[in-house]
Swiss-Prot record:
Top-level taxon of the source organism: Eukaryota
Entry membrane topology: Single-pass type II membrane protein
GO cellular component: Golgi apparatus; Golgi cisterna membrane; vesicle
Tissue specificity statement from the Swiss-Prot or TrEMBL entry: Expressed in thymus and monocyte derived dendritic cells.
UniProt protein name: Alpha-1,3-galactosyltransferase 2
Ranges that cross the membrane: 13-32
Cytoplasmic side: 1-12
Keyword Transmembrane: yes
Length: 340
C-alpha cells in the first residue's frame, strides 16, 4: 500500500509538470477553454491507508473510500470527502429519521433571480433534497408576494423572509452572510437542527440526502478541484480580512453550497460578515466577495465533511469520468441581464 501511495504521489507531480507546460502553451496558442480539458489528467491523490480505515461518519456509519480509488476521499485532517459509492444512502436516511431531524435550506432570490430560478430550484428540491425528512425552506427576497407556490410534501414548509434590495449584485452576495447570521439567531435557528445555504441559480438533478449532513460542511468547487493549492483563486491582497498567504489553503470551496449545525453556521456567518465589514470600512472588496471570506474561514476552521463536486456540478465543464451522479447542476447564468 505504501508503494502504491508513493507511485501515486510521483505520478501526481509528473502530471502537474506536464499540465503546466501544456497549459502555458495552450494559453498562447488556443486560449483558456482548450486548457480546461487537460486538468482532468491530474490525479487527485490518494487517501492514506491508515486514514482510510478510520473514516466514519455520524450519518453514514463506516465509509467505503476504497470504492472510489480514482479520487481523493479524505482531507489531510481526516475528514471524509463524500463521493457517490463511498457511502450507504439507506444507512444515512435511517439515522436521520431516528434522530427526528428538521433540516433547513436557505435561498436568496433577489431581483430577477427570483423569477428566473426560484421555482425550478424549489420544485427539484422537493424531488431530491432530503426526501422523507422534515425540511424548512427559508426564502429571502424583497418581493415575498412573488414567491411561486410549490406543492410541498408532508413535514415540509416554506417560510418567506423579506430583505432589502441592495444597489449592486456584489452587495447582494455579501449581505447574505449578515442576514444569515441574524436568521440563525432567530426563529430559523430554533426550528432547524442542521442548515444548508445554497445559491438559487442551480437545480437539483439527483439525491441530496442526509449523507451530506455534518457539524460543518464545505463544497469542493467544480472548476478548481483538480488544481494544486498554489493555483487556487484565494484572496491574495494582504490588506483584506480574507487574505491568505502563498502556501496557505488546501481546497477551494464553493459558496453556492455550505452547511452544518446551527451553532457552526453562526460562527461561520459571524466570521464572514465581520470580515466583509472590515474590508468595507477600509474601501476593500475581496476578489470573490463572500466566497473569499468563506474560504478563509474553512482554512482556519476545518470542515467536518467535504462534498465532492458531484454535489454541485457545472455542466459547462462537460462530462468527467469521476462525476457519476451530479446532485446539483449550475443553471445558465445570463449575468448581463440578471445583474443589470
Amino acid at each position: 500500500m505504501a508503494l502504491k501511495e508513493g507511485l501515486r504521489a510521483w505520478k501526481r507531480i509528473f502530471w502537474r509538470q506536464i499540465l503546466l507546460t501544456l497549459g502555458l502553451l495552450g494559453l498562447f496558442l488556443y486560449g483558456l477553454p482548450k486548457f480546461r480539458h487537460l486538468e482532468a489528467l491530474i490525479p487527485m491523490g490518494v487517501c492514506p491507508s491508515a486514514t482510510m480505515s478510520q473514516l466514519r461518519d455520524n450519518f453514514t456509519g463506516a465509509l467505503r473510500p476504497w470504492a472510489r480509488p480514482e479520487v481523493l476521499t479524505c482531507t489531510p485532517w481526516g475528514a471524509p470527502i463524500i463521493w457517490d459509492g463511498s457511502f450507504d444512502p439507506d444507512v444515512a436516511k435511517q439515522e436521520a429519521r431516528q434522530q427526528n431531524l428538521t433540516i433547513g435550506l436557505t435561498i436568496f432570490a433577489v431581483g430577477r433571480y427570483l423569477e428566473k430560478y426560484l421555482e425550478r430550484f424549489l420544485e427539484t428540491a422537493e424531488q431530491h433534497f432530503m426526501a422523507g425528512q422534515s425540511v424548512m425552506y427559508y426564502v429571502f427576497t424583497e418581493l415575498p408576494g412573488a414567491v411561486p407556490r410549490v406543492a410541498l410534501g408532508p413535514g415540509r414548509r416554506l417560510p418567506v423572509e423579506r430583505v432589502a434590495r441592495e444597489r449592486r449584485w456584489q452587495d447582494v452576495s455579501m449581505a447574505r452572510m449578515r442576514t444569515l447570521h441574524a436568521a440563525l439567531g432567530g426563529l430559523p435557528g430554533r426550528e432547524a437542527h442542521f442548515m444548508f445555504c445554497m445559491d438559487v441559480d442551480q437545480h437539483f438533478s439527483g439525491t441530496f440526502g442526509p449523507e451530506a449532513l455534518a457539524e460543518s460542511v464545505a463544497q469542493l468547487h467544480s472548476w478548481h478541484y483538480h488544481w494544486p493549492s498554489w493555483l487556487l483563486p484565494f484572496e491574495r491582497d494582504a490588506h483584506s480580512a480574507a487574505a491568505m498567504a502563498w502556501g496557505q489553503g488546501d481546497f477551494y470551496n464553493h459558496a453556492a453550497v455550505f452547511g452544518g449545525s446551527v451553532a457552526a453556521l453562526r460562527g461561520l456567518t459571524a466570521h464572514c460578515a465581520g470580515g466583509l465589514d472590515w474590508d468595507r470600512a477600509r474601501g476593500l472588496e475581496a476578489r470573490w466577495h463572500d466566497e473569499s471570506h468563506l474560504n478563509k474561514f474553512f482554512w482556519l476552521h476545518k470542515p467536518a465533511k467535504v462534498l465532492s463536486p458531484e454535489f454541485c456540478w457545472s455542466p459547462d465543464i462537460g462530462p468527467r469520468a469521476e462525476i457519476r451522479r451530479p446532485r446539483l447542476l449550475w443553471a445558465p447564468k445570463g449575468y448581463r441581464l440578471l445583474r443589470n
